[in-house]
A protein has these predicted regions:
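Residue-level signal for glycine
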Residues: 23, 57-59
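Short aromatic-glycine-(Arg/Gly/Cys) micro-motifs in beta-strand/loop hairpins
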Residues: 2-24
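Short arginine-rich
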Residues: 41-53
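A cross-kingdom feature marking charged/low-complexity
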Residues: 59-77
Length: 77
C-alpha cells in the first residue's frame, strides 16, 4: 500500500494540507491547529507520516503513524 504522507504547510495568511506527491490541497484553513487536526486523522487512517512545516516552510515536526496510532515524534531544528 502506498504511503499517504500528509504535509501541513503555510499558504498565504493560512495553512494547507497536501498529500505528498499530489498537486492539489486536501484542505485550506485559517489556522494551523485545524490543518494539523485534519492531516493527523488522514495520517492515522492511512498509517502514514504527518509532516508539519513552520511559517518559514521548514519542517518543524514529524509524527509517524506508520506502525499504528501512537506517533513517534521527531522534532526538526
Amino acid at each position: 500500500m502506498k504511503k499517504r504522507n500528509q504535509h501541513v504547510i503555510p499558504l498565504g495568511n493560512g495553512w494547507a494540507v497536501k498529500e505528498e506527491g499530489k498537486e492539489r490541497f486536501s484542505l485550506i484553513s485559517q489556522t494551523q491547529k485545524d490543518a494539523i487536526h485534519f492531516a493527523r486523522e488522514i495520517a492515522k487512517t492511512n498509517q502514514a507520516e504527518l509532516i508539519i512545516h513552520g511559517k518559514d516552510g521548514r519542517i518543524r515536526v514529524r509524527d509517524n503513524y506508520i506502525n499504528g496510532s501512537n506517533p513517534q515524534k521527531v522534532k526538526q531544528h
